[in-house]
C-alpha cells in the first residue's frame, strides 16, 4: 500500500502548513447569521485599527531599510500589495504551539517580539479578527479568573497541605519524641536493671566480705581468747608455782624447826629406851628430801603439785616422828616420875617404920597452905620441850605478821581495799558456822579452802583471791586463825554446843593447810596460856597490867575484867581446843593421821596434872576439857585414862581443894561431881552438841 503511505505524508504536511495550524471554532455556525451579516455590510475600520497603527506600522517601517526603497516605490508597492495587519495572538499561537497564551500583563512582551507583516484585509475580515480577538480577550480573562480561582484553590490546598504537613510534622515530632522517650525509658530500665544487678552483685560481695570478715573476726577472737586463756593459764601456773614455792619454803622452814626440836631431845637421851639416833637419821633424811625437792623445783622454774604433796608427806612424817618421840619422852618422863614416886614412897615407908607409930600421922596438905610449904613433886613451870614448842609457835606467828606488814601498813587505797576484801572473805564464813545443816557447813568449808588455795571466791558481791597481793595468803591465814580462836572466845563461851561445828571446820582446814593450824595454836596459846599448859611467871620490872594480860585477862583503861568473864572466855577456848583434837573433817583423807590429835589431849592432861593447880582456874578448865574430850580419850586410852581419873580424884582433888576459897568452890564441886559420876557409871557421856552422822546428811 504505497499510495496509502503517501496520503499520510500529505496530511502531515498539510497539518504542518500555516493553514493547518489555524484554529477553527466549531461553534461558529451558532453565529452564522452574524458572520453573514458582517460579510454583507460595508467594510469599516476595526476597533483595533488604532492599536495596529500605533503598534504594528511603526515597527514595519523601521524594519524596511531606507536604501532599498524609495518613497515612490514604497508608496506604489503599498498601493499594489494588500494591506498588512499583525497576526492575532491566537493565530500566532496556532502557528506556533510552543508559545502559550499570556495574560494582559504579558502584552509588552508580545509586543517586543517580532511581528509579521500581514496584508490589510477587508473591513469584514478585520471585524472578524477583532471579534476573534475580543473573544480571545474574554476567554483570556475567563482563563485568568479561573486561573486566579485555581491559584486560590491551590493556595488553599497548599495551605491545607501545609497545615496537614505541619500537623503531621508535629505528630512525627511527637512520635519521634515518644520513640526517643521510650528508647530513653528502655535505656534507663536497662541501666537500672544493670545497676540493680551490679548493686545485687555488690551486696552479694559485701555479704560475702562480711561473712568472711565475721569468720575472720571469730577466728581472731578465738585466737585472742586462746591467747588470753593461755596467758591466764600461764599466769595462774606461775602464781600457783610461786604459791607452791612459798609453801615449800615454809615446809622447809618448819622441817628445820622440827629438826632442831629433834636435836634438842638429846637431853632426854638417858631416859629413852629407844635409839634416838634412828629418829635423828630419819629426820635428816626428810630434811634432805625437802631440800632436794626445792632444788629440783628451782631448776624446773616452778614446783609441781606432786612435789608439794611429797614435801607435805615428808613434813607430816617428820611431825609424826617428832610426836612419837615426844610420846616416848613423855612416857619415859612418866615412868621416871612414877619410879621416883615409888622410890619416895619406899623411902617414906622405911622412914615411917623406923620412926614408929608417929609416922602414921596424917601428912601435911600437898599444896602450900597456911604455914605449910609447896609439895616438891609438882612444878609450876612447864617442861622445856613444851616451852620450846610454845615459843616456836609464837615466833612463827610473829614472822607471819612481819610478812604481811607491807599490806597492813600500806597507804594505797587499792591495797587497803584488797586488805578489807581479804579480811571479810576470811572471817565472814567462820562467823556463819552453825549447826543448821551439814551441807551448809560443807559450803563454808569449801569456800575457805578455795580462798586458801588461791581460787577466787565471792565476798560482798566481788570476786576475791589471795593472788591479788603477794602477801595476801599470809594475811588470810593469820586472820582466819585469829577468827577461829575469837569464835571460841566469844561464841563457844556463850553456847557450848557451837564448839563442835567450829572445831570440825578448823580441823579440816588444819589438815589441808598446816600453817593455819600452827597459827590457831599460836593465837590460842597467846590468849589462853593454860591451853599450853603454861603459867606465866611475874618478872621483876614487869608492869602488873602486862602480867595480867600474859595470864589471859583483858585490861582496858587500867581496869581488869571480872573473874567470871575471864573464866567464861578461857572455858570457851579450852572447849574449842578439846573439840579440835578429837574431830576430823568427814570428807577428808581418813588414811592420814590427825594433824593435832588426841595424843596432844593426853599430853595436855598429863602436863596440867604435873603442875600446881590454880585457884578456880584449874578446876574450871579440867571440867570443860573432860566434858568435851573425856569420851574420846576414854575410847582411845581406856584403862590408862581411868587410872588418870582415879589419880585426879585421889591425888589432885585434895590439892585443888586446899587452895580454893569458900567463895570459889563452885567450879571445884562441879568437877568433883562430874568425875564421881563418871567413875560410878564407868562411862563418860558423849558431850552435848556432838555432830552425829545424821547431821552430815542434812
From Swiss-Prot:
One of its GO terms (molecular function) is inositol hexakisphosphate binding. One of its GO terms (cellular component) is centrosome. It is found in: Nucleus; Cytoplasm. The keyword S-adenosyl-L-methionine does not apply. PANTHER family: GLE-1-RELATED, MRNA EXPORT FACTOR GLE1. Belongs to the GLE1 family. Associated with the NPC, however it may not be a stable component of the NPC complex since it shuttles between the nucleus and the cytoplasm. Interacts with nuclear pore complex proteins NUP155 and NUP42. Isoform 2 does not interact with NUP42. Able to form a heterotrimer with NUP155 and NUP42 in vitro. Required for the export of mRNAs containing poly(A) tails from the nucleus into the cytoplasm. May be involved in the terminal step of the mRNA transport through the nuclear pore complex (NPC). The modification Phosphoserine is found at residues 41, 88, 99. Residues 151-277, 305-356 form a coiled coil. It comes from the Eukaryota. Residues 65-79, 86-103 have a biased composition (Low complexity). InterPro entries: GLE1 (IPR012476), GLE1-like_sf (IPR038506). Keywords: Coiled coil, Cytoplasm, Disease variant, mRNA transport, Nuclear pore complex, Nucleus, Phosphoprotein, Protein transport, Translocation, Transport. Its main location: nucleus. One of its GO terms (biological process) is mRNA export from nucleus. This is mRNA export factor GLE1. The gene is GLE1. Residues 1-29 are annotated as: Interaction with NUP155. The keyword Transcription regulation does not apply. It comes from Homo sapiens (Human).
